[in-house]
Design a protein with these regions (language model features):
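Compositionally biased terminal segments of proteins
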Residues: 1-208
Length: 208
């Protein structure tokens, strides 16, 4: 695991809260970054397939700041680290891995989620994350197969997902992520070009 993508405070928080998160798994950008090592990530996003009582979990966590708290959803801060705890019914397609007594979604499950995230909000970090998987791990065709395996029965509009892969307007105004990988291939213009140049492959892979 690439712990150098996290701050010292984030690692301390992860250690402190792990005893209370037996029903949760870490995913999102941080879950991916600690497996690929491609960028710095500041937030810790946890998901549970089991409904949970927000008040009970908050009592155990004792965060410094509560941002949102309702049934199945908590957003809070501890030592300046943003934490999210969400009830998310969608099952994982691959076994979780263990890191510091925490369950972490496999990078392949997070890859599928990155397609979905891009279709919903298209943040620059999400584009970079999916790009990192495609540069470092698998082909476009394999990534599309992973997405279908995870979400084929979920009712997600695959045409919308496809169009979102080349819609960069919202991402353009966001800051660049802090990367641990260097080179012209990792510049934002190269990331955009990759998706544009491979859109036919994505179309074939997503719309089978």
């Amino acid at each position: 695991m690439f712990e150098n993508v996290l701050s010292k405070e984030a690692i301390e928080v992860a250690d402190a809260i792990s005893p209370f998160l037996k029903d949760f798994y870490l995913a999102g950008g941080t879950g991916l970054a600690i497996q690929l090592g491609h960028r710095v990530s500041m937030d810790l996003d946890f998901f549970s397939q089991t409904p949970f009582e927000s008040e009970t979990l908050l009592y155990k966590l004792s965060p410094d700041k509560i941002i949102t708290a309702r049934e199945g959803t908590i957003h809070c801060e501890q030592k300046g680290i943003k934490l999210s705890f969400l009830f998310y019914r969608e099952p994982l397609a691959y076994p979780v891995i263990l890191w510091k007594e925490l369950s972490v979604a496999d990078w392949k499950d997070i890859t599928a989620e990155k397609f979905k995230a891009i279709s919903q909000r298209g943040s620059k970090r999400d584009f970079y994350d999916l790009y990192a998987v495609l540069k470092m791990k698998i082909t476009v065709e394999e990534a599309c197969e992973i997405f279908r395996k995870r979400f084929n029965l979920s009712g997600i509009n695959k045409y919308h997902v496809l169009k979102s892969l080349v819609f960069f307007e919202d991402a353009e105004v966001e800051p660049e992520p802090i990367l641990h990988v260097k080179g012209r291939d990792w510049e934002w213009v190269s990331v955009k070009s990759y998706f544009e140049d491979n859109i036919k492959k994505f179309e074939k892979g997503l719309l089978l």
